[in-house]
Amino acid sequence: MPTPTPDAGPEKRSEARAAGEAVRAPLDRKRQPSGDEARGRAMLAAIGAIAEKGAGAVRMSDIAARAGMSTGHILYHFGKKDRLLLEVLAWSEADLGARYQQAADEAATPAEKLALFVRFYLPRHPGDERYALWTQVLAQPHDDAGRQILTDLSDAWEQRLEAVVVEGRATGQFADVYLPDFVIRAVAMLNGLSGDVMFGRTRWQNASANAFALTALERELRPTDRP
């Protein structure tokens, strides 16, 4: 979070005080949230605003209105707008990844974990806000640091899938597939299905993309000595 440096000049200190006053100012006399609660609310509001208006058109005031906060409070969390997309995506993915891991830790078998992976990876419905955020971010130009963040986020999901398959192979529940190639095929299929779901392809009106993906993965992972 941006804070004034000790050697900041009078102008910077004045700006910092103004920002601090904006953060502390009540909005419609309602209590301003603080800490993790405030950051979570700001992030969720940003996801919705970006999905609705697009990355290029969204304003900090749009996010503030959705979050029920002052614009100064939003600026406190994001600083400049050019940091917005990657910060929000990183937060969204960390939140989704943590919820997946909690569910996976409670699952009894690798097969259950595989089903959870598919459910958490695919968008829930056409226009899913979290997946829309992915597409908005990918459409933007990025420097090397930004591309590394996106690579790390993608790699994290591949590593989750690898962990499930490794566990299933160790217990004899999954076939001994060549892991790098399997992950590439699995992720490519899931990404293609995600596009279908987001677009609202009619083929999925009476069928489940989740069930289709899971059946395909289970078929490839089924040990050869099982029917």
Predicted regions located by residue number:
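N-terminal intrinsically disordered/low-complexity leader segments
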Residues: 1-37, 225-227
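Helix-turn-helix
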Residues: 38-41, 45, 49-83, 87
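Solvent-exposed, amphipathic alpha-helical segments
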Residues: 41, 45-52, 99-106, 133, ...
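Short coil/turn segments at alpha/beta junctions that flank glycine-rich nucleotide-binding fingerprints
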Residues: 52-56, 107, 171
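Hydrophobic alpha-helical connector segments
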Residues: 87, 100-131, 182-186, 210, ...
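Short, basic, alpha-helical segments at the C-terminal edge of helix-turn-helix-like DNA-binding modules
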Residues: 90-96
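Short secondary-structure transition hinges
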Residues: 119-162
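Hydrophobic/aromatic-rich alpha-helical bundle segments in the mid-to-C-terminal region
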Residues: 147-151, 155, 169-217, 224-227
